[in-house]
C-alpha cells in the first residue's frame, strides 16, 4: 500500500515540476484528463467499508451493531494504514421516512385503493363490517392522511424543517383530523377530555393504524418493527424467502432509497450488512442484489448479525452466496481483522482472499463448494477480546433527530423502550451466568463473557453522548454485571459535577447482589429501569430452566429496585417442555401477586421454543431428558434453529388467558381476580398461598433492616448520597439534618465532632468516590461517626458498596 501511495505522490510531484501550470490551465482538457487517470490509479487502491442496517428494526434508536463495526473498522483502517472511508447507513429509520411522508403515502394509496375497496367488499360479504368500514374510510380519507402525515411524524420525532408541537392542539381535538381504529380505541377509553399531552400517543397510534392499512391493502409483509419476518424463519425454504424480494415496500421504496445512498462510491467497496432478526433478512438480500448489480467485481458483500449466528449457522444453500460473498459469524472482529490484515499486505481485493482456505469465523462458497469456517484461532480470539474490552461504539453517522419516539402505550416501562433516542451499548459481551436451559448457551454471544474496560468505556460513551446530544443509555447486555453497573454509576456521578448526568437502563439478573444499598446507589447514579427474566415463577420452574436464582432472590431484587424508584420489567416463559398445568397456574398466580404488590411494572409471556443451540437440547443429545422427544426434521440447506418436539402445541391454548390477564395487570386492573378464571376451559386452582409474595417481602424487609443495623465493616467501602447535610441547634444540643428521597431527616451528634462529621460526609459523597481513599472505608467512618450515628445514616443516604 505504501509503495502505491508513494508512486502516486511521485506522479503528482513530477506533474507539478515538469508542466507549466499556466499552460495546463489554458488546456483544461489535458489537465483534467491527466488527473482523471491519476484518480483512477488512486481509486484502485482504496477500500471503502459501508455498514448497512436494512429495515426494519426498532425505530426510535439505531441497532448497535453498526456503531461497534464502525468503530472497529476505523480503528483497523488506522492501524493498517488502509485508504478509504468507513460509513454506517441506518436504512431502517430512512425507510420509515420514505414511507411516512406526503409523497410516500400518496404512492401507497394510489397503488392500493382498488385492492382495498375490493377487499372491503369481500370482508363485508363475510360479515366483517368493521374491517370493511375501516378500509373504505382509509381510502376516503387518503387525501387527509397525506395532508397530515408530515405533521404527525413531526410530533413523534424532531425535524429540521417542521415543528410538530404547534400541530398537537389541532391534531388531538379537530373533527377533521384523520382517525383509525387504534386511535379511536384509545380515545374511547379515556375517562377525561383529550389534551395535548395525548398527542404523542395518538400520533404513534396513527402510524400504527396506517401500518395496518399498508399490511392489509399494499404489502402483506409490512410491519412497523419487522419486515417479512415469517419469510426467514426455520420453517421456510430459501426459494420462498426469495419471493419476498418482489414485495411492494422493497421495490417501490427501499430499492430507490438504497441506490441513492450508495451510488457514488469509488474504488473497492466492502459492504457489511447486519441481519439481527429474521425480519431484516429479505431486505438484506435486496440490498446485496442491488449492490452486486451496481458494483460487480468492485464490491464484496458480507452478512453478519444475530440471525446469521443462530439460524444460518449450518447453512449450505449455495444460492445464498449469489447475494453475499461470505457470512461472518459471532462478533466478526476476528474474521474482518484477518481479511483486512491480508488485504493491507497484498492489496488485492477482499474477494480474492476467499481462495478456498479456511478463515476464522467465515463461511463462503467457491466453485460450488461451501468452505466451512475455521472455528478456533487463539491469536484472533485474543484480539477479539481486546476489541470487546476497548471498542467504543461510534454513532457519528446517525442523525438522532430523525428517530421517531413512539408512545403507543401508557405503561411507563413500555414507554421507555420506544420513547427516547437511546445509545444502545453493552458493558459486557456474553452472559456471566450462561447456564439457562432455554438459552443459546453454546453460541459465542452467550457463552463467551467479557467485560469492557470500565474507565475508558465510560469516557468514550460519554463523549458519544456529548457529540450527539443524546444522554440516554440502553444497556443491551444479556445481563449487566452488578459490579459494572455500580462502577458506571459512580463514574456517572463524578462526571455530573461539571457535566450533564447520563440516564441509563438495561437487562439484569434478579439476584441477591441487588440489595437496597446497590439499588439506591444505582438510582442516584442514573439507573431508571431494569428488565430481567423470571421465566417460571415457581421453585420447580426456576430449577427446570436452571435459572440459578430462587423466588426469594427475585422478590428481594424487585423490592430493592422499586424502593429506589426504578421501573421493573420481567420476561416470563410458558410451555417449557416439562412444565405441568399446575406449575403454569402457580407461576401465573405468583406473577399476579408481584403486580399486586407493586413489584413489577410490566412483563411479557414468551412461548418456549426448543432451539438447536440451547442447553436443554445439547443435554438431550448427551442422553439426558429422555421424556423430551424432538421431532426429526427434513434436512434443510437454509435456516435451521427451531426444533419441533412432541407436545409443543399443547401449551398454545394458554396464550390468550395469560396475555389478557397480563394486559390488565400492567394497567393496575383486576389484580384480585382469580387467575384460573381467565381461561375458557377448566384450569386447576393455584396451590401456592395467597400471601406467598407478601411473606417473601417481609423476609426481604427483615434482611434489609438487619443489614442497616450491622456494625461498619473495617475494609468495606461506603458512599454518601444524602445531599448536603446541615447542623441545627436543638434543645438537646446539635442535630444533623439532611434530605433523602424526599424526606427531611435528623440525627443527634456531639457538638465537638459535628464539623468533622459534616466534612467527612461531604468528602465521601458518591460524586467524589476514590477507591484508594481510606475516607470511604468503614474503619474511617466508624472513627468519626461512631457506631450509633453510622447506623442512623444507613439506608438513609449512607450506602455500602459491593
Language-model regions, residue ranges each:
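Conserved SAM/AdoMet-binding glycine-rich loop
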Residues: 49-57, 298-302, 458-567, 576
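Glycine-rich beta-alpha loop elements in corrinoid/cobalamin-binding modules
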Residues: 56-59, 64-65, 69-105, 116-119, ...
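N-terminal [4Fe-4S]-dependent radical SAM core
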Residues: 369-424, 743-745, 796-802
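Radical SAM enzyme core and accessory elements
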Residues: 26, 35-36, 43, 47-54, ...
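Structural recognition of alpha->loop->beta junctions
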Residues: 317-338, 521-529, 586-610
Amino acid at each position: 500500500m505504501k509503495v502505491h501511495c508513494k508512486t502516486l505522490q511521485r506522479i503528482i510531484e513530477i506533474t507539478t515540476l515538469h508542466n507549466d501550470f499556466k499552460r495546463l490551465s489554458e488546456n483544461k482538457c489535458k489537465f483534467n484528463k491527466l488527473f482523471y487517470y491519476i484518480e483512477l490509479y488512486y481509486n484502485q487502491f482504496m477500500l471503502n467499508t459501508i455498514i448497512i442496517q436494512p429495515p426494519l428494526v426498532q425505530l426510535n434508536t439505531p441497532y448497535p451493531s453498526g456503531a461497534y463495526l464502525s468503530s472497529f473498522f476505523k480503528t483497523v483502517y488506522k492501524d493498517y494504514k488502509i485508504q478509504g472511508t468507513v460509513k454506517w447507513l441506518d436504512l431502517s429509520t430512512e425507510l420509515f421516512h420514505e414511507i411516512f411522508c406526503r409523497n410516500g403515502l400518496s404512492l401507497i394509496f394510489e397503488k392500493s385503493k382498488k385492492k382495498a375497496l375490493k377487499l372491503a367488499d369481500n370482508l363485508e360479504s363475510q360479515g366483517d363490517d368493521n374491517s370493511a368500514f375501516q378500509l373504505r374510510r382509509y381510502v376516503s380519507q387518503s387525501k387527509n392522511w397525506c395532508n397530515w402525515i408530515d405533521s404527525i411524524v413531526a410530533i413523534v420525532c424532531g425535524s429540521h424543517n417542521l415543528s410538530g408541537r404547534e400541530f398537537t392542539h389541532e391534531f388531538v381535538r379537530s373533527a377533521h383530523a384523520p382517525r383509525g381504529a387504534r386511535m379511536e380505541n384509545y380515545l374511547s377509553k379515556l375517562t377525561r377530555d383529550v389534551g395535548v399531552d395525548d398527542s404523542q400517543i395518538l400520533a404513534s397510534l396513527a402510524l400504527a393504524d396506517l401500518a395496518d392499512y399498508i399490511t392489509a391493502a399494499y404489502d402483506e409483509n409490512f410491519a412497523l418493527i419487522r419486515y417479512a419476518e415469517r419469510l426467514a424463519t426455520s420453517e421456510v425454504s430459501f426459494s420462498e424467502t426469495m419471493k419476498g424480494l418482489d414485495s411492494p415496500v422493497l421495490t417501490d421504496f427501499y430499492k430507490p432509497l438504497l441506490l441513492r445512498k450508495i451510488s457514488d462510491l469509488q474504488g473497492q467497496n466492502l459492504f457489511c450488512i447486519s441481519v439481527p432478526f429474521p425480519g431484516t433478512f429479505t431486505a438484506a438480500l435486496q440490498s446485496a442484489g442491488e449492490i452486486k448489480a451496481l458494483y460487480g467485481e468492485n464490491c464484496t458483500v458480507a452478512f453478519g448479525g444475530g440471525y446469521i449466528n443462530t439460524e444460518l449457522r449450518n447453512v449450505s444453500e449455495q444460492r445464498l452466496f449469489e447475494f453475499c460473498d461470505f457470512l461472518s459469524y459471532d462478533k466478526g472482529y476476528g474474521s474482518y481483522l484477518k481479511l483486512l490484515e491480508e488485504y493491507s499486505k497484498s492489496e488485492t481485493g477482499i474477494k480474492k482472499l476467499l481462495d478456498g482456505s479456511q478463515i476464522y469465523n467465515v463461511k463462503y462458497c467457491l466453485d460450488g463448494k461451501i468452505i466451512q469456517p475455521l472455528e478456533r484461532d487463539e491469536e484472533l480470539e485474543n484480539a477479539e477480546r481486546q476489541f470487546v474490552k476497548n471498542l467504543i461504539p461510534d454513532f457519528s453517522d446517525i442523525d438522532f433527530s430523525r428517530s421517531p419516539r413512539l408512545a403507543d402505550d401508557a405503561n411507563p416501562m413500555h414507554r421507555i423502550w420506544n420513547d427516547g433516542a437511546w445509545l444502545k451499548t453493552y458493558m459486557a459481551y456474553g452472559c456471566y451466568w450462561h447456564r439457562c436451559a432455554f438459552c443459546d448457551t453454546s453460541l459465542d454471544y452467550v457463552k463467551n463473557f467479557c467485560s469492557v474496560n470500565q474507565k475508558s468505556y465510560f469516557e468514550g460513551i460519554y463523549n458519544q453522548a456529548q457529540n450527539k446530544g443524546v444522554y440516554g443509555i440502553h444497556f443491551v447486555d444479556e445481563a449487566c454485571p452488578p459490579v459494572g453497573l455500580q462502577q458506571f454509576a459512580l463514574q456517572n456521578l463524578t462526571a455530573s459535577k461539571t457535566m450533564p448526568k447520563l440516564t441509563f437502563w438495561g437487562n439484569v439478573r434478579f439476584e441477591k447482589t441487588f440489595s437496597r444499598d446497590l439499588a439506591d446507589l444505582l438510582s442516584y447514579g442514573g439507573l431508571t429501569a431494569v428488565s430481567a427474566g423470571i421465566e417460571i415463577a415457581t421453585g420447580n420452574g426456576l430449577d427446570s430452566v436452571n435459572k440459578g436464582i430462587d423466588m426469594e432472590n427475585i422478590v428481594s431484587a424487585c423490592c430493592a429496585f422499586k424502593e429506589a424508584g426504578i421501573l421493573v420489567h420481567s420476561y416470563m416463559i410458558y410451555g417449557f417442555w416439562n412444565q405441568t398445568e399446575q406449575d403454569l397456574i402457580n407461576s401465573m398466580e405468583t406473577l399476579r401477586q408481584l403486580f399486586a404488590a407493586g413489584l413489577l411494572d410490566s412483563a411479557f409471556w414468551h412461548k418456549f421454543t426448543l432451539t438447536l443451540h440451547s442447553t436443554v437440547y445439547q443435554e438431550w443429545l448427551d442422553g439426558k431428558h429422555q421424556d423430551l422427544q424432538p421431532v426429526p426434521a427434513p434436512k434443510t440447506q437454509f435456516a435451521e434453529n427451531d426444533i419441533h418436539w412432541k407436545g409443543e402445541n399443547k401449551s398454545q391454548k394458554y396464550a390468550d388467558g395469560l396475555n389478557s390477564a397480563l394486559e390488565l395487570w400492567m394497567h393496575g386492573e383486576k389484580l384480585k381476580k382469580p387467575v384460573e378464571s381467565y381461561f375458557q376451559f377448566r384450569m386447576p386452582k393455584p396451590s401456592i398461598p395467597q400471601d406467598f409474595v407478601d411473606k417473601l417481602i417481609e423476609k426481604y424487609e427483615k434482611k434489609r433492616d438487619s443489614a442497616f443495623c450491622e456494625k461498619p465493616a473495617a475494609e468495606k467501602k461506603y458512599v454518601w448520597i444524602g445531599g448536603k447535610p446541615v447542623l441545627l441547634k436543638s434543645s438537646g444540643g446539635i442535630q444533623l439534618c439532611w434530605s433523602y428521597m424526599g424526606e427531611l431527616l435528623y440525627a443527634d451528634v456531639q457538638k465537638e465532632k459535628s464539623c468533622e462529621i459534616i466534612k467527612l460526609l461531604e468528602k465521601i459523597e458518591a460524586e467524589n468516590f476514590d477507591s484508594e481513599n481510606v475516607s470511604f472505608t468503614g474503619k474511617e467512618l466508624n472513627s468519626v461517626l461512631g457506631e450509633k450515628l453510622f447506623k442512623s445514616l444507613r439506608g438513609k443516604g449512607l450506602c455500602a458498596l459491593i
